[in-house]
Amino acid sequence: MARYTGPSCRLCRRENTELFLKGERCYTDKCAIKRRNYPPGQHGQGRTKTSDYGVQLREKQKVRRIYGILENQFRGYFERADRLKGVTGENLLFLLERRLDNIAYRLGFASSRIEARQLVRHGHFTLNGRKVTIPSIQVKAGDVLELREKSRKVACINESLEAVVRRGIPQWLELDKGAYKGAVKTLPAREDITMPIQEQLIVELYSK
């Protein structure tokens, strides 16, 4: 499945929730879902009855779009989560949260996960002192993500760091803004993931 390249705000309206795909715009009145809180398209404002399968599918699509994961990748994460000890749905969210690009976003180095992924791929970060370019790396407790010296004057990164106070930093992460580095204090717990996600619906979908 190809990566979606259309309007990001259209996806938020389709999933009827804020996916925070457009950075700081999502925190303003310009957010599309605040202005037009109904699905896109000619029949977007019409009433529709959604089947159980449709509800499960929409939840999967919502989570996949939040983290910017392709379908095959997402299924791979689910299969891995299913093999781990614990609750499959929660394991899935933990794996997604521990992606390096998500950590860069959560710490405030980028205004969106898409931007964070680009920064990682372009070699702007080191992980535990080593340059990294793979967004899907799974971080662990104690890992330190640092912006490389040559990247510290990039305007969009500094703007994101200044604005991170608005959305906050998860308790399981720690940011030293002055040193352009952040640390993974501990692995995330379910209560740390505050987005409106019903992961059990995804488990039900893939269990069919």
From Swiss-Prot:
CDD domains (UniProt xref): S4
InterPro entries, per database record: Ribosomal_uS4 (IPR022801), Ribosomal_uS4_bac-type (IPR005709), Ribosomal_uS4_N (IPR001912), S4_RNA-bd (IPR002942), S4_RNA-bd_sf (IPR036986)
Keyword Ligase: no
Gene3D superfamilies noted in UniProt: Ribosomal Protein S4 Delta 41, Chain A, domain 1 (1.10.1050.10), RNA-binding S4 domain (3.10.290.10)
GO molecular function, one term: rRNA binding
Keywords carried by this UniProt record: Ribonucleoprotein, Ribosomal protein, RNA-binding, rRNA-binding
Pfam families given in the database record: Ribosomal_S4, S4
Signal peptide segment: none
GO biological process: ribosomal small subunit biogenesis; translation
Protein origin, superkingdom: Bacteria
Any GO CC annotation of this UniProt entry: small ribosomal subunit
All copies of domain S4 RNA-binding, residue ranges: 98-158
PROSITE patterns per the UniProt record, alphabetical: S4 (PS50889)
UniProt family annotation: Belongs to the universal ribosomal protein uS4 family.
Function summary: One of the primary rRNA binding proteins, it binds directly to 16S rRNA where it nucleates assembly of the body of the 30S subunit. With S5 and S12 plays an important role in translational accuracy.
Assembly mode: Part of the 30S ribosomal subunit. Contacts protein S5. The interaction surface between S4 and S5 is involved in control of translational fidelity.
Protein name (Swiss-Prot/TrEMBL): Small ribosomal subunit protein uS4
